[in-house]
Amino acid sequence: MAGNAVDNANHLTYFFGNITREEAEDYLVQGGMTDGLYLLRQSRNYLGGFALSVAHNRKAHHYTIERELNGTYAISGGRAHASPADLCHYHSQEPEGLVCLLKKPFNRPPGVQPKTGPFEDLKENLIREYVKQTWNLQGQALEQAIISQKPQLEKLIATTAHEKMPWFHGNISRDESEQTVLIGSKTNGKFLIRARDNNGSFALCLLHEGKVLHYRIDRDKTGKLSIPEGKKFDTLWQLVEHYSYKPDGLLRVLTVPCQKIGVQMGHPGSSNAHPVTWSPGGIISRIKSYSFPKPGHKKPPPPQGSRPESTVSFNPYEPTGGAWGPDRGLQREALPMDTEVYESPYADPEEIRPKEVYLDRKLLTLEDNELGSGNFGTVKKGYYQMKKVVKTVAVKILKNEANDPALKDELLAEANVMQQLDNPYIVRMIGICEAESWMLVMEMAAWGPLNKYLQQNRHIKDKNIIELVHQVSMGMKYLEESNFVHRDLAARNVLLVTQHYAKISDFGLSKALRADENYYKAQTHGKWPVKWYAPECINYFKFSSKSDVWSFGVLMWEAFSYGQKPYRGMKGSEVTAMLEKGERMGCPPGCPREMYDLMFLCWTYDVENRPGFAAVELRLRNYYYDVVN
């Protein structure tokens, strides 16, 4: 996404940010216009792209650097590079399509920072408001949504931001647009944009000498927008920004946005809003007033018998439904927040959380087929009738014939932990039923365990795996902050709601730590998953969030190995001996080096030097943003 790519270039002394071509040329003139003098700037046409401005023979030459789908950067027809800096370094040795070698960077003058683009000015506020009002989220649920889905949200906001702009009038007719432009002031350059059809095309209506001119804005097969034979842009607001600086094929520059009838320009929430003064040279840069629809409740869940809550159709990398709408552009991509398990079922104020964790068996319906089984018994799909909705649930059913009090105690202990947890990346408990068997009723994650899913879907790309393990790190960071130790973190205990949404499950071994504790000491060695355990767990029976970090490193190895078993063919004692010698599992084939480095860091022998989940999540987050953008 544009924002992150720009953030990654801000450290370059020769990066000037969102300056115009003319401003770039002025800087090169200041530098003497010597052959090979160059600077880097943000592309004003392409999201996430850059432009290279080079002096040669006393003239400035400009090259667009586009960000490819795989995250690399290239000048059209040239070779791909990992970053704009790498591209510049390469062209300092090989001209390959440029007028000359890049010889000397023109650095920003002292005290000058890269110029912020119009979208960066609005982005953070737009994202926050969009998430608040689309999903009616608040507090931690809001923050978690923004952190985990920021790349997708940035792209979404960037491509739909025009809908918040005063100059966008949606699906009105040509006649209506003319009438609207002619109302009020007759300032030359007054303009609006309207949607033309369902194929994603628009029309620019521009007032010049009392007449309304119409320019068609077409969308090509790659999704780029342009007036006929004009420059191409990724978004409408980039197109408007460009033509507010120069006519470039229009009869004149865009000056004053024609507002929708009944819309007052000013600051949001201001009852006596003062009109904003508009002038050529960057309309978007001064747009600080945009109005969102009033917050509303989420659409009501479907009735019993309609689509399941964890539908398999969610995919944040592909559009859902029809491609283009008259008012919407590309349909919004589905995200974890669209599922019914992102928030607690009790987030709805009308769904009153019961004082007791025990549920009424008559309100629970079970399907016959098993989702899974284990030493404890079986897991079945079910439906629980809440006050307002029927909730699709997973039900862990204790073996009845065993009548083992220890199994019952384990189930109740797990329920005791789960009832205290509420996070989008942790499977929540709905309650317990005591009937023909003891039952633990939980949120449904229909796609099943992460390890099995990856074993069966080896086509899943790295960025999808990184997305999922980042979500797990967010859930574990929440556990760490809540003073809980999981003690059984493994890919088999991460369940998928969709291909792009993971939740941590199986809290049977989990322990709550007192405020004055930072570890739990087990009294005896149990049936432990030793291959996932840190040395201090095996040697001293000590468990902490730091030992969960070790397990998380093993989980990452499982994920990037597409569900392979760690330390395959080795006994627990052999694994322990291997770790004591300082040896670790090797990097899975094809795994990004940055991800293996993080695994290795998680496997730091000394618990004091091992990072906590706050550091692990942040490192994963930054890498995830980088590869997805």
UniProtKB/Swiss-Prot annotation:
The keyword Kinase applies. It is an enzyme of class 2 (transferase). The active site is at 488 (proton acceptor). Autoinhibited. Intramolecular binding of the interdomains A and B (also called linker region) to parts of the catalytic domain keep the catalytic center in an inactive conformation. The phosphorylation of the interdomains or the binding of the SH2 domains with dually phosphorylated ITAM domains on transmembrane proteins disrupt those intramolecular interactions allowing the kinase domain to adopt an active conformation. Interacts with LYN; phosphorylates SYK. Interacts with RHOH (phosphorylated); regulates mast cells activation. Interacts with NFAM1 (phosphorylated); probably involved in BCR signaling. Interacts with VAV1 (via SH2 domain); phosphorylates VAV1 upon BCR activation. Interacts with GAB2 (phosphorylated); probably involved in IgE Fc receptor signaling. Interacts (via its SH2 domains) with CD79A (via its phosphorylated ITAM domain); the interaction stimulates SYK autophosphorylation and activation. Residues 14-106, 167-258 form the SH2 domain. Belongs to the protein kinase superfamily. Tyr protein kinase family. SYK/ZAP-70 subfamily. It comes from the Eukaryota. The SH2 domains mediate the interaction of SYK with the phosphorylated ITAM domains of transmembrane proteins. Some proteins like CLEC1B have a partial ITAM domain (also called hemITAM) containing a single YxxL motif. The interaction with SYK requires CLEC1B homodimerization. GO terms for biological process: adaptive immune response; amyloid-beta clearance; angiogenesis; apoptotic signaling pathway; B cell differentiation; B cell receptor signaling pathway; beta selection; blood vessel morphogenesis. Residues 259-364 are annotated as: Interdomain B. The modification Phosphothreonine is found at residues 255, 311, 339, 378, 524, 576. Keywords: Adaptive immunity, Angiogenesis, ATP-binding, Cell membrane, Cytoplasm, Immunity, Innate immunity, Kinase, Membrane, Nucleotide-binding, Phosphoprotein, Repeat, SH2 domain, Transferase, Tyrosine-protein kinase, Ubl conjugation. The modification Phosphoserine is found at residues 43, 201, 270, 289, 291, 310, 313, 344, 373, 573. Pfam families: PK_Tyr_Ser-Thr, SH2. This is Tyrosine-protein kinase SYK. The gene is Syk. Gene3D superfamilies: Phosphorylase Kinase, domain 1 (3.30.200.20), SH2 domain (3.30.505.10), Syk Kinase, Chain A, domain 2 (1.10.930.10), Transferase(Phosphotransferase) domain 1 (1.10.510.10). GO terms for molecular function: ATP binding; integrin binding; interleukin-15 receptor binding; kinase activity; non-membrane spanning protein tyrosine kinase activity; phosphatase binding; phospholipase binding; phosphotyrosine residue binding. It catalyses: L-tyrosyl-[protein] + ATP = O-phospho-L-tyrosyl-[protein] + ADP + H(+). GO terms for cellular component: B cell receptor complex; cytoplasm; cytosol; early phagosome; nucleus; plasma membrane; protein-containing complex; T cell receptor complex. Its EC number is 2.7.10.2. It is found in: Cell membrane; Cytoplasm, Cytosol. Residues 107-166 are annotated as: Interdomain A. Autophosphorylated. Phosphorylated on tyrosine residues by LYN following receptors engagement. Phosphorylation on Tyr-317 creates a binding site for CBL, an adapter protein that serves as a negative regulator of BCR-stimulated calcium ion signaling. Phosphorylation at Tyr-342 creates a binding site for VAV1. Phosphorylation on Tyr-342 and Tyr-346 enhances the phosphorylation and activation of phospholipase C-gamma and the early phase of calcium ion mobilization via a phosphoinositide 3-kinase-independent pathway. Phosphorylated on tyrosine residues in response to IL15. Ubiquitinated by CBLB after BCR activation; which promotes proteasomal degradation.
